[in-house]
Amino acid sequence: MAPCTLLLLLAAALAPTQTRAGPHSLRYFVTAVSRPGLGEPRFIAVGYVDDTQFVRFDSDADNPRFEPRAPWMEQEGPEYWEEQTQRAKSDEQWFRVSLRTAQRYYNQSKGGSHTFQRMFGCDVGSDWRLLRGYQQFAYDGRDYIALNEDLKTWTAADTAALITRRKWEQAGDAEYYRAYLEGECVEWLRRYLELGNETLLRTDSPKAHVTYHPRSQVDVTLRCWALGFYPADITLTWQLNGEDLTQDMELVETRPAGDGTFQKWAAVVVPLGKEQNYTCHVHHKGLPEPLTLRWKLPPSTVSNTVIIAVLVVLGAAIVTGAVVAFVMKMRRNTGGKGVNYALAPGSQTSDLSLPDGKVMVHDPHSLA
């Protein structure tokens, strides 16, 4: 198995998953960043249920604590938050050690800034059986080591990671991870879905429209927007006379809108005057049927254009008449001689280690 680079996973925040009948996912993303001369490495951990961030820990906070990031998590009592805070602080120490160990493996100096990351969690189906478990690590933005889909073996990305793999294989760490992913991870996902049922199991249909962006005298860009939808799983495609233009589209990753919903757009360059031949198709579970959109010059714009053109013609005629009358009058007043004029003054014109128990716990084995 080739693990996905965690920087890309973090940038994307979370791969889209469906809600209601399933599948569902629980995932944690953890990052430790060394900063020589500025104190201890910064440690950040965030947790997601499906497409929603629900917990966070930041070692740079005034009072570093595991805290809720979704209103429904406030139902958990003080004991839960205290326990998770202690686990996060324990994991913070593990990541600091791992950063130093990785620097040694790669023969790096202590003067540079480095990043160690981890993503772990589980995907479950509608029957609550495990579909996929994750334990992936990255160093300086590159894959380091990952638990394979069989949850029994590891894939090391390079010779440095081979050292860690041998150590973890000897210690039987894969078995420990597997027990968590098949058991407690699934149970905690069920718990969080119960707490956030109204939010996590909702469906917000996208609001879609097409915008027009001139490029040159021969072509334009048509951009199809989908806004305010949840969950994040959505498909936008452009078609020309019924044929998909997937290879010719510019497609951005689905992005959080900041209000619990998501947004996305897809663009295609088309010949000027051929805009009507292109259609955008939007597929989302919140829609009773897929949307089909086409760029059209709004009727109001056509009417306004006609009105403006008429007004321009009338205005030009009025101005021309006024100028002619003014000149004729001045010529009469001056006996046909021209008059010189001068302008008056001023008249110019947008975690964790090996889980155990609930969410987080210190790994029994570091990279060393």
Swiss-Prot record:
Region (Alpha-1): 22-111
Stretches assigned to the Cytoplasmic side: 329-368
Ranges for domain Ig-like C1-type: 206-294
Ranges that cross the membrane: 306-328
Carbohydrate attachment residues: 107, 197, 277
Parts of the chain on the Extracellular side: 22-305
Keyword Disulfide bond recorded: yes
Topology with respect to the bilayer: Single-pass type I membrane protein
Bridged cysteine pairs (disulfide): 122-185, 224-280
Residues covered by region (Alpha-2): 112-203
Protein name: H-2 class I histocompatibility antigen, K-D alpha chain
Organism, as annotated: Mus musculus
Gene that specifies this protein: H2-K1
